Design a protein with these regions (language model features):
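Bacterial signal peptide processing site
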Residues: 26-28
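An anionic, turn-rich surface loop/hairpin at beta-sheet edges
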Residues: 99-123
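Hydrophobic/aromatic beta-strand elements that line small-molecule binding cavities or substrate pockets
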Residues: 52-55, 86-91, 113-120, 141-145
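Bacterial N-terminal signal peptides that target proteins for export
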Residues: 2-14
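N-terminal glycine/threonine-rich, aromatic-flanked beta-hairpin/loop signature
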Residues: 50-93, 134
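Tryptophan-anchored aromatic micro-motifs
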Residues: 32-51, 67
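Edge beta-strand at a domain terminus
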Residues: 83, 133-147
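C-terminal motif of bacterial Sec signal peptides marking the signal peptidase cleavage site
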Residues: 21-24
Length: 147
């Protein structure tokens, strides 16, 4: 009797797991996620960050963006543009999840991995949620294919 009950519950969990697995990546192009692993991409500017150009080659992701620094002088406050290039290691767990790790971290926060979940794929882009380390901070955005 206990075995029957166990198998019934086990079967329900297995079916539930398979349904969740199938629904976990909301996309019309599920089989075409490989096209995001190599190439040149863009993340548009958002609240708190500037437009970022991303180049993926093998296991590296090279990011270029402008960082603004405020400089105070006697005649006023000025914004200085600095072009920043960061190199990160990228490791794909599957077509919908990858981890980024700074090649040369400059701060303690840079040492934490960035976990990225692809939530939705379209013809020329994907929506993602990124989480830094094991913090509760999450950032959502969209990556567009450039080349």
């Amino acid at each position: 009797m206990k075995n029957k009950h166990f198998y019934k519950i086990s079967s329900i969990y297995t079916i539930l797991f398979l349904v969740l697995l199938l629904l976990s990546c909301n996309s019309d192009n599920n089989n075409d996620a490989e096209r995001f692993k190599l190439g040149i991409f863009e993340i548009p500017a958002g609240k708190g960050y500037s437009k970022t150009t991303v180049k993926r080659i093998d296991s590296l992701q090279i990011e270029e963006y402008i960082k603004y620094t405020e400089i105070s002088t006697d005649s006023g406050v000025f914004k200085k543009e600095n072009k920043v290039i960061d190199t990160l290691y990228i490791k794909w767990k599957n077509n919908f999840f990858y981890t980024l790790k700074m090649k040369s971290p400059k701060t303690e926060l840079d040492k934490d991995p960035i976990f990225v979940q692809i939530n939705k794929i379209t013809k020329n882009s994907y929506d993602f949620t990124a989480k830094i380390g094991f913090s509760e901070f999450k950032q959502k955005g969209t990556v567009y294919i450039i080349e």
